[in-house]
Amino acid sequence: MLVTFRPCGPKDHKVLLRLIIAYYRFDKIPFKRESLSRGLDTLLRNLSQGQAWMLETHHNKAIGYAILTYNFDLEYGGVEGMLTDLYVEKRFRQRGVGSLALYEIEDFCRERGIRTIELQVQHHNKSADTFYRSTGFRVLPRKVMILAVRPEEKRPLRRPIAGTRL
């Protein structure tokens, strides 16, 4: 089976969104369609944020996608790639499609001086965990934490008064 791996642009929004929703449902990731669509639009129109790719058969049928965004981390010497999504439709898995995507993404990063690629795997997704480990990813001894930025009035903490002894 011949598979192509090509960069996406704004014209790919509809197909990519369909694949992203399929991936989020498969991996049990909660989502709001409007939020995904808005974020995807931003990514596809602003390549300084990252890059999306489409995985297609030789008949131009979309069978998966990948999204790499950029993060800055001193620990890794500057810009690192964050592989936020890599999805291959079920009937095309175990055929080297994911490996092709990772190979191309690693080349993309190397060409841009990005020395590290980070990703997250859902605890229940054992096949993804096994796949990524087999390609050289390693588990860090850390927890992932996130904070959704809230409006000022909904914050549980109040701003400390400058000059006060804590």
Residue spans for each PLM region:
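Conserved beta-strand-loop-alpha-helix junction that forms the acyl-donor binding cleft
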Residues: L119-A128, I146-R150
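Conserved GNAT acetyl-CoA-binding A-motif
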Residues: L102, C109-Q120
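Conserved acetyl-CoA-binding loop of GNAT-fold acetyltransferases
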Residues: R133-R142
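Residue-level recognition of the GNAT/N-acetyltransferase active site
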Residues: N71, E89, Q122
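Acetyl-CoA-dependent GNAT
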Residues: P7-K14, R18-G78, T84, L102, ...
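Conserved acetyl-CoA-binding loop-helix of GNAT-fold acetyltransferases
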Residues: V88, Q94-D107, T130-S134
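Short coil/turn segments at alpha/beta junctions that flank glycine-rich nucleotide-binding fingerprints
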Residues: V79, R95, R112-R115
